[in-house]
Swiss-Prot record:
Localization per record: Secreted, Cell wall, S-layer
InterPro entries named in the record: SLH_dom (IPR001119)
PROSITE patterns assigned: SLH
Membrane-traversing stretches: none
Signal peptide: 1-23
Function: The middle wall protein binds to peptidoglycan and to the outer cell wall protein.
Keyword Chloroplast: no
Protein name as it appears in the record: Middle cell wall protein
Domain of life: Bacteria
GO CC annotation: extracellular region; S-layer
One Pfam assignment: SLH
Length: 1053
């Protein structure tokens, strides 16, 4: 029996000469095929024989049932009687089969041949579903075996079908048969020897012949294992595959194969292969084939000889006369009998001989020594283990070997190999590929697919249009011909958290994700900013891989299963962010951490709580060693508006929490003010003097008040800004730092007015997610039009939904330097989903936050070119000035842009502080008088008109003084446990507002052994022998009415 050995280290050649990702099962889940591999082979084989057809869309309905008419058609075709069916179209055999029915001729012929039989009422019931019992009965009759069947139907027919290997284990004979099962039974029947009547008259006799449906009726030449045995030959006499498209492109077509079969009676012939057969799978092997005799002979089935051993593995070690052989320059033909190859995974060795055929990277070598010299040299020089397909002869020696360099990267050797590379962009029209490193592969331009080049995806024939961004690809050359190219791509991607990083040597790092380990070699690439910058991993950059422990990554694997490209889940500007200190550091005695607040370049204010060992100075030394005094941090980590303003780099861990802080040392620090700054800053060319402003430059608006009254300094209202806004002002005082690339590292705006940043206004369409970020789509003003735009959020869309922001609400928002909506700054200007009124407008605080100068509500009574006359709640008429650039939003009917307003519309009119002039910029239509009458919304309309923006306290708003959850630590001293917890007041709560602090342990109020309240930080301790089940800290406001609680969970220190 043939053995096919697939090494786990092989290139997943899987009976193919095409390299493909062996680790495909380790990739992200993909859609399963609708047919398994065996079923697909069966269907394609039957289709090539003209017996079955699909629905024209790649579907064959293998899980559907089949009618009696359809099944009769199949059997008639299998008997080669299709032409007779055309002549029998107008016979009247059954009462319910009309001559106009497409199946009439097939049913009539099947009946005439006694393959099918009707019912006592002379009907055929063509639309009835065929049962398993009926199906095997018709097939047994078609094969001529009905005279040999004895017993009661249907068991007798089922037994005969099992005996003939047509169908086994039919347990539900009266159930409707599926098309897939019918196809399998018919396929099994094709090779069954036919039974025919050989004597007639009174002495009727039947005999089993040497003919089959294939050979007698379908005109198919069969050369398979049975043929070899019956003809007195052996498997060596089966045809040998001597040329396939991946090697002989140009000499044979993409759908052809050349066979050498003198003993098989087919000579050296090139055949067309049916759809679904990948001839490249069988190069160098003896094969079994069915060849349909037609105008153009077509191979409808092909499989390897079951007596030939084919091994899929990787090249290990070459030995010559028992010694390791790595210098092949003196190798000669006389050495072949003593040359052995040990395969990498199986560790078995096989000997070459003078008849061994050698192919290397799809190039055939007439002299095997020439090919082996190249293979041995390249394999040794690169430290690779190339993929190999090995075919053994009857003496267990290598008859054929195809070695593929599926591991080298960035190779550009025309006629040999290009790649591997990672696809960044595909131009299907020009057949051009842009790589992740921005290099381009243009050699396919002007070439004809299928004639001048072939494409394979995961080892199977594909189209150039199937190639996508993120795939790893290499290009080889058919038989070394520079004009005949082979593009091999894989789409194996592994995503998950790195559990472990292991280094075997300076050129072998391994990443463990789940229960799988993946190897990274020098030459692979890395990106942690969404592939804006792609870094080669070389001897100077292994730290990029070494630092991936506990990170979520995407690994793009090459054909051998090695890592070709690494992407972190989050971009570097999400994980490593420049920041400024906004609240001074203080030492937390209960956690041994330094706690302070920062504002990141993304506009997020974050509380940092880190041990000294995770805080690094300008020289990369942490404050827990290297003679560093961590007490200095109290004087260093403070907010400032001077030239000594500290720029930090905060690294977030996989959970988005600060895990490391580094001080960024500037090369230069400069300061300019007023007109001098305005002249220096060029927003058009993105320059500050001679220094370039890049997309990585951090811009901070630090014009808020620096409070120094308490021990902990705090910078109020710190925000981020855009360079174009900062560069366009002439009343600012600005500090900027420069790095060693003459780029502006950071800009600190420390004094000045008018830098609030323009507010955006828009009508909410929906929320979504793209590129790993939550998004919001809005209709917003663009000049005098309303356009649809999608923004990424800098936070969670659920935070907006929690504020009851929904579709059709009108909001004000700002975007940060990355054009992401700052979630914390979103203001719901008009709540269209409010209960009890047509729409609810924001209060004075909301107007201030949204930078709205004026906002009114009203019922439109008249409209002129530049004036809207409206009525208020008291039916007083008022006028509102509008302009040509005023835009109109429909918040209740058609949504989005409105053409204007009409008498009877209920409106909200807004004058934005960001747009010059006092005329109204936005008119929002929330309903109309007709709708109010129809839906009986008079009360809602009255409530709407009574609104006047004012500061209104929310009676349901609770005093939010503490975080909801706090983690404390406990230690044991004999039977006594010492519980300690620290909690910081929320940023908007002042320490002087707190009147009382209480501690509850296991549901009871207790007196803490330690209670310290300083600079807004509460430290509390309690000693007891009891085990904690629940605990909380409660604070009460000085008004005596408001209180807040924090649940404390204790973990062992």
């Amino acid at each position: 029996m043939k053995k096919v050995v697939n090494s786990v280290l092989a290139s997943a050649l899987a009976l193919t000469v095409a390299p493909m990702a062996f680790a495909a099962e380790e990739a992200a889940t993909t859609t399963a095929p609708k047919m398994d591999a065996d079923m697909e082979k069966t269907v394609k084989r039957l289709e090539a024989l003209g017996l079955v057809a699909g629905y024209g869309n790649g579907e064959y309905g293998v899980d559907k049932t089949i009618t009696r008419a359809e099944f009769a058609t199949l059997v008639v075709r299998a008997r080669g009687l299709e032409q007779g069916a055309k002549l029998a179209q107008f016979s009247n055999t059954y009462t319910d089969v009309k001559s106009t029915d497409w199946f009439a001729g097939f049913v009539n012929v099947a009946s005439g041949e006694e393959i099918v039989k009707g019912f006592p009422d002379k009907s055929f019931k063509p639309q009835n579903q065929v049962t398993y019992a009926e199906a095997v009965t018709m097939i047994v009759r078609a094969l001529g075996y009905e005279p040999s069947v004895k017993g009661v139907w249907p068991n007798s027919m089922i037994s005969k079908a099992s005996e003939l290997n047509i169908a086994r284990s039919i347990t539900t004979p009266n159930n409707a048969a599926t098309r897939g099962d019918i196809f399998k039974m018919l396929d099994n029947a094709l090779r069954v020897d036919l039974m025919e009547q050989v004597e007639f008259g009174t002495d009727i006799r039947h005999e089993i012949t040497k003919e089959t449906l294939l050979t007698k009726y379908l005109k198919v030449t069969v050369r398979d294992m049975e043929w070899a045995q019956e003809a007195g030959n052996d498997s060596e006499d089966l045809p040998l595959v001597t040329n396939v498209p991946a090697i002989g492109l140009g000499k044979i077509k993409a759908n052809e194969v050349t066979l050498n079969g003198k003993d098989a009676g087919i000579g050296n012939t090139t055949y067309k292969v049916a759809d679904g057969i990948n001839a490249n799978d069988f190069d160098g092997q003896h094969v079994q084939v069915w060849i349909k005799d037609d105008k153009e002979d077509v191979i409808v089935w092909m499989e390897g000889s079951t007596d030939q051993e084919v091994i899929m593995d990787r090249v290990g070690e070459f030995t010559l006369k028992g010694k390791t052989f790595e210098d092949p320059k003196d190798l000669s033909n006389s050495d072949l009998a003593d040359l052995k190859l040990e395969l990498d995974a199986s560790e078995k060795s096989y000997r070459f001989n003078k008849n061994t055929k050698v192919t290397y990277n799809f190039t055939r070598f007439n002299d095997p020594v020439d090919g082996l010299k190249e293979i041995i040299k390249d394999n040794a020089d690169g430290g690779f283990t190339f993929g190999a397909k090995v075919v053994l002869d009857n003496n267990n020696e290598i008859a054929y070997i195809h070695v593929i360099d599926d591991q080298s990267m960035n190779k550009e050797d025309e006629g040999v190999k290009y790649g591997s590379e990672v696809i960044s962009k595909i131009d299907t029209d020009k057949k051009k590929i842009t790589n992740r490193d921005n290099d381009k592969f243009n050699d396919l331009d002007g070439k004809e697919e299928g004639k001048d080049f072939l494409v394979f995806l995961n080892g199977k024939p594909a189209k150039f249009s199937d190639l996508k961004e993120g795939m790893v690809y290499s290009v080889y050359y058919a038989d070394g011909d520079e004009d005949k190219l082979l593009v091999f791509a894989t789409d194996t991607v592994v995503e998950g958290k790195v559990d472990k990083v292991v280094s075997r040597n300076n050129n072998d790092y391994r990443l463990t994700i789940g229960d799988k380990t993946y190897r990274v070699y020098e030459g692979a690439t890395f990106s942690d900013d969404g592939n804006k910058d792609v870094q080669d991993i070389d001897k100077d950059h292994w730290d990029l891989v070494d630092s991936l422990d506990d990170e979520t990554v995407k690994l793009y694997l090459d054909a051998s299963g090695r890592v070709r490209h690494i992407e972190t889940k989050d971009a570097i500007d999400d994980r490593k962010q420049k920041a400024i200190v906004t609240r001074s550091a203080t030492f937390n005695t209960s956690k041994d951490t330094w706690d302070f607040r920062v504002l990141t370049q993304k506009g997020k204010e974050i509380t940092v709580s880190l041990e000294a060992k995770n805080i690094y100075d300008f020289d990369g030394k942490n404050f827990s060693r290297d003679n560093k005094n961590q007490d200095d941090l109290e004087d260093i980590l403070v907010p400032s508006k001077d030239k000594d303003t500290l720029l930090l780099e905060v690294t977030l861990d996989a959970d988005g929490k600060p895990g490391k802080v580094e001080f960024l040392k500037p090369v230069k620090v400069e300061q300019e003010s007023g007109k001098a700054w305005d002249d220096l800053a060029d927003e058009d060319d993105d320059m500050v003097g001679d220094y370039e402003v890049t997309d990585k430059t951090a811009v901070f608006n630090m014009t808020g008040k620096l409070e120094e009254s308490s021990k902990r300094k705090e910078l109020k209202n710190a925000k981020t800004a855009k360079f174009k806004d900062v560069a366009d002002e002439n009343d600012l005082s600005v500090i900027y730092t420069v790095n060693d690339k003459d780029e502006v590292e950071a800009i600190f705006v420390v004094e000045g007015d008018g830098l609030t940043g323009d507010a955006h206004y828009g009508q909410v369409i929906d929320f979504g997610r793209k590129g790993g970020k939550d998004t919001i789509r809005v209709w917003e003003k663009d000049g005098d039009k309303v356009v649809e735009k999608e923004y990424k959020l800098d936070g969670d869309q659920d935070d907006l939904k929690d504020e009851d922001i929904r579709r059709n609400d009108f909001i004000a928002f700002t975007v940060d330097s990355n054009d992401e909506v700052v979630v914390d700054d979103v203001v719901e200007v008009v709540n269209k989903n409010a209960k009890g009124m047509l729409a609810e407008v924001t209060d004075e605080k909301g107007m201030k936050d949204a930078n709205i100068d004026k906002m009114v509500v009203g019922l439109v009574s008249d409209v002129s070119k530049d004036t809207i006359t409206y009525k208020d709640a008291d039916d007083n008429k008022k006028k509102a000035s509008i302009k040509s650039a005023t835009v109109y939003f429909d918040l209740y009917d058609d949504f989005g842009e409105a053409d204007g307003v009409n008498e009877g519309d209920y409106v909200v009119m807004i004058d934005s502080g960001d747009i010059s002039g006092t005329k109204y910029d936005y008119v929002l239509i929330v309903s109309d008088a007709k709708t109010v009458r129809k839906d009986k919304l008079e009360d809602d309309a009255e409530a709407f008109l009574k609104q006047e923006p004012s500061e209104k306290p929310d009676p349901d708003t609770k005093w939010d003084a503490l975080p909801s959850k706090v983690e404390g630590k406990f230690t044991s001293a004999g039977p006594v446990k010492l519980y300690r917890a620290t909690v910081e007041l929320n940023s908007k709560v002042k320490a002087e507002d707190v009147d009382a602090i209480e501690f509850y342990f296991n549901g009871k109020k207790v007196e803490p052994s330690l209670l310290n309240f300083k600079d807004g930080v509460i430290t509390i301790g309690y000693n007891t022998e009891d085990k904690v089940t629940s605990s909380k800290i409660k604070v009460t406001n000085k008004n005596g009415k408001d209180s807040d609680e924090a649940t404390v969970t204790f973990v062992e220190a």
